[in-house]
């Protein structure tokens, strides 16, 4: 077995394992009494795939639902507008996991909670303004990027895109929201496989060729959770989506969201990521020659 095929198999197995856990272990270790208190005060609630609130009993019975914690006031540096944070996780087979968490707590296996938490893909929603007053809000669905968003890497433009999206939404008269998709690292292949693709890119392949060399899709992101959250917060309103990727618009439309206006979002172009962005342009992203600083 070659190194590439071994990495590819490991990445696929990792994704399947995460998906299994994602579908079965999503909302774990909050103590039942605290959970009830949060539910009573309306800070813990569930929505279905159409963005409608549902009662907790229905959520516990299974199905494609999402549990949400919020709103949580979140002061952000460089932001004068008030921002409210919602933490969001899938909610299938919740009862079994809560029982497991209760058992771990009773047996004082505190270290096991970190293991459970490591498999939870907790997405976030950052809301600027009052959704009840929105008419055509500005929205960014942002895929997690540890290297760009956290480390400030210039191999991509993700960090500047995230920061600028918040600034643009803050300055927009309608306000809006950012949905941060924590399971989308490396366009859905995960951080480990993404690191391998970086090495392949340094050997001459572009970002999509590197994925294919590992036997992985060009883009394996799932936007179904983002669509449900948009249905909840935007509630049937038209909205503007900050993206250069028409496929993202198509994916959301296929999940039942209509009346989306794509808004160009070019920022953070440097010599370090121009080749990467050129590959995106070739793949279908709406980037002009001027956007990439080419003559």
Language model feature labels by segment:
Residues 2, 7-295:
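Catalytic domains of riboflavin
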């Amino acid at each position: 077995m070659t190194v590439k095929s071994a990495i590819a198999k490991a990445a696929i197995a990792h994704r399947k394992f995460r998906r299994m856990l994602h579908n079965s272990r999503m909302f774990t270790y909050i103590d039942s009494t605290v959970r009830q208190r949060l539910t009573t005060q309306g800070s813990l609630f569930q929505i279905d795939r159409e963005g409608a609130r549902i009662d907790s009993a229905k959520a516990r019975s299974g199905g494609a639902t999402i549990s949400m914690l919020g709103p949580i006031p979140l002061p952000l540096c460089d932001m004068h507008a008030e921002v409210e944070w919602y933490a969001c996780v899938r909610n299938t087979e919740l009862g079994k996991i809560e029982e497991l968490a209760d058992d771990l707590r009773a047996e004082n296996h505190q270290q096991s909670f970190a293991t459970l938490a490591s498999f939870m893909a907790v997405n976030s929603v950052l809301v600027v303004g009052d959704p009840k007053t929105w008419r055509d809000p500005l929205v960014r669905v942002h895929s997690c990027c540890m290297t760009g968003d956290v480390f400030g890497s210039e191999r991509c433009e993700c960090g500047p895109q995230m920061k600028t999206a918040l600034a643009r939404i803050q300055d927009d008269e309608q306000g809006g929201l950012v949905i941060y998709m924590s399971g989308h690292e490396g366009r859905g292949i995960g951080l480990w496989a993404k690191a391998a693709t970086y090495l392949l890119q340094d050997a001459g392949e572009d970002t999509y060729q590197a994925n294919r060399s590992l036997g992985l899709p060009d883009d394996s992101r799932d936007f179904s959770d983002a669509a449900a959250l948009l249905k909840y917060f935007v509630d049937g309103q038209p909205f503007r989506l900050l993206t250069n990727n028409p496929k993202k618009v198509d994916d959301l439309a296929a999940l039942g969201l209509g009346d989306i206006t794509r808004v160009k979002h070019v920022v953070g172009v440097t010599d370090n990521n121009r080749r990467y962005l050129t590959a995106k342009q070739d793949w279908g992203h709406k980037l002009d020659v001027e956007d990439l600083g080419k003559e």
